[in-house]
Amino acid sequence: MTVTERITALRKQMKEKGIDAYLVPTDDFHGSEYVGDYFKCRKYITGFTGSAGTAVIMQDMAGLWTDGRYFIQAAQQLEGTPVTLFKMGEPDVPTIHKFLEENLKEGMCLGFDGRTVSAEEAETLEKILQKKQVHFSVNEDLIGNIWDDRPALSCEPVMELSEKWAGRSRADKIREIRSKLKEKGADLFILTSLDDIAWLLNIRGNDIHCCPVVLSYLVLDDSELRLFVNEKAFSDSVKEALSKDGIAIYPYDDIYTYVQTIPEEKKVFLSRSNVNSRLVSSIPKTVTILDGENLTLLPKAIKNETEVQNEKTAHLKDGVAMVKFIHWLKKNVGMKEITELSAADKLYEFRSGQENFQGNSFDPIIAYGAHGAIVHYSATEETNIPLEPKGLVLMDTGGHYLEGTTDITRTVVLGPVTEKEKKYFTAVLRGHLNLAAAKFRYGCTGLNLDALARGPLWAMGEDYNHGTGHGVGYLLNVHEGPQSFRWKSPAALPAPVLEEGMITSDEPGYYAENEFGIRHENLVVCKKAEKTSYGQFMKFEPLTLVPFDLEGIDPEQMEAGERKLLNQYHAFVYEKISPYLNEEEQSWLKKATQEI
């Protein structure tokens, strides 16, 4: 079926069920950022493949809302379909809430699958549409009804992550969460975020492409821990190990009937912004629900000493693979055919040569020339183009290792570049270096520091439409909260204090539509600096070990202090990486890290 035919079939279903508007978010049942193939309902109904966006279908309109990262891609993919693009955050573009408020008439019905909408979002919709007396149909998976060849729910094998890698036993983590639960004055903790469950239980899976998580729900009280999963994914030895730590396994879908049996005097702690609305509405009304961020969120984000040391090893391996790849690319571009897709395959080959490599941490972005301006471009057979010995290629890639997760962007010069490309290449790099070198008082958040990265671009009246940085998981999701670098805070994302052990990306960029894109990204770990009469100061230490391309830099634009920062970083890269290279690669790296 084409997108047009699918929308026609959905509208027929809506008519039969008395639903006037149907909301299709990107989410799975766990509020995951990236979702398994079974859950890709929004992609199915609109044809848009980006990782963020929400569709609204009515009898006379179909709309897709997405953010600045995806404006170009969405416009291309929606062409020729009945779906209108709503560019979130742009002037005169209504939010989904505003749109529904204005377009749903009194007494109409809004439908969605309550398992794919958070309790918080469902409550917000109810409040907004209350005065129109809009009613809700939240138990219908209408896309599932029309999707004939829908993939099955994933059930990939589960592995245990040993203490050697995790740095802490699951028993120790469970004790910490039980004590936090007690502090909150609650009896039960309901956890549905997949990466939090994997972190807490020291297990990893493969139920979402590039995200080593296990489809699961978890309920913990002071004596029991119930895990709702597909038991087939667990070997006997993993089940035995979990059982030893007091973890009982139940069927995945049983969570909905289980929560109906929670005794009325109990207090349940959960995160309404994470737990889906069907699950929360299944809890008896007499049960007290305490809402707050997941008790696992901060302990997971603050990496322990073992994790930090392991991550340094992961980044050393990744640096070796990246340096070998960039050397190979520069040597061969123009000599043999290299495309965006074949370059990604070659990089995978270099990473695979590293011990304990587990796979990509996200789909690689190898974006040549004008493709670089599409922030989250992902080459397909249709869009794939050859790399030529001129201009820039933006490469945002990462790997999972038993020692941790990497995420790196390098913009590589393949041949002659324009003055404009050099100007912005240098401005973005200056911002990156300024943020990486920040020293700040304990208590600062990413909001306090973001302008350091944007400063050089802001001075030119320029900017980029994405956050400057995100947290990164340990052999988990490459985008992990709660910390970030951004210049304004959405109400839903409180800005947490930057703590020692947090790993965050530093990735300013610049995008000239239809021309080129530039992004420079390292991961940095937050460390304690000195303590003075003003209190504790903090700093960042780089984890990523790959040179920035000197051929893209105009040293005249840089202040002496910025050149010094770059030279120090490059000397550090050479010292760490060169022992793992052959002679030819070593002499190339020597030149690539020379002082400017």
What are these regions (language model features)?
Residues 1-596:
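Active-site neighborhoods and metal-handling regions in enzymes and metal-associated proteins
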